[in-house]
């Protein structure tokens, strides 16, 4: 594989992640965040994608100290957006997993709708062939991130 093109692709991927995140946070209607912070919304999104997760793993995903996650979880628990699930392997509190509640999923539906509405004008004029390519590339990357077959 051409090293220069690979470097260009990786740099573009990182830039799209950063610029896309900034764009979405700037464009999303503030009403979506009237009850929770952006960091709490990101935590809910992680739980939706990953399923029941330990606080330590959540800290790793958000690249913050466990105390920051504890504070976020406390607020989300008080609002009924997450709940503790017992880990089947162990019985102490340290082994409990946090899970999203139906109320938390409802907040995420509002957030997903706001993200869609913010990004739609940017993507709406991309032709079908390029859109198919984007979906195909993201599907391959997602599979590779999860340790799947590279030839999918």
UniProtKB/Swiss-Prot annotation:
DNA-binding region: 55-78
Gene3D superfamilies named among the record's database cross-references: Winged helix-like DNA-binding domain superfamily/Winged helix DNA-binding domain (1.10.10.10)
Ranges of residues in domain HTH marR-type: 3-143
Keywords annotated in UniProt: DNA-binding, Transcription, Transcription regulation
Regions crossing the membrane: none
Any single biological process term in GO: response to stress
Superkingdom per UniProt: Bacteria
InterPro entries cross-referenced by the UniProt entry: HTH_MarR-typ, MarR/SlyA-like, WH-like_DNA-bd_sf, WH_DNA-bd_sf
GO molecular function: DNA binding; DNA-binding transcription factor activity
SUPFAM superfamilies linked to this entry: Winged helix' DNA-binding domain (SSF46785)
UniProt xrefs under PANTHER family: TRANSCRIPTIONAL REGULATOR, MARR FAMILY, TRANSCRIPTIONAL REGULATORY PROTEIN
Name of the molecule in the record: Uncharacterized HTH-type transcriptional regulator YdgG
């Amino acid at each position: 594989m051409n090293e220069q093109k690979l470097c260009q692709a990786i740099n573009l991927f990182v830039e799209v992640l950063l610029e896309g995140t900034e764009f979405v946070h700037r464009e999303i209607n503030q009403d979506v965040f009237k009850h929770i912070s952006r960091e709490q919304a990101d935590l809910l999104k992680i739980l939706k994608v990953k399923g029941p997760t330990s606080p330590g793993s959540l800290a790793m995903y958000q690249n913050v100290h466990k105390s920051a996650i504890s504070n976020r979880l406390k607020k989300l628990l008080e609002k009924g957006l997450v709940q503790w699930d017992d880990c089947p392997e162990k019985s102490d509190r340290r082994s409990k997993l946090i899970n999203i509640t139906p109320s938390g999923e409802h907040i995420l539906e509002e957030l997903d709708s706001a993200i869609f509405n913010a990004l739609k004008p940017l993507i709406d004029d991309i032709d079908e062939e390029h859109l198919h390519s984007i979906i195909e590339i993201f599907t391959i990357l997602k599979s590779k991130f999860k340790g799947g077959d590279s030839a999918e």
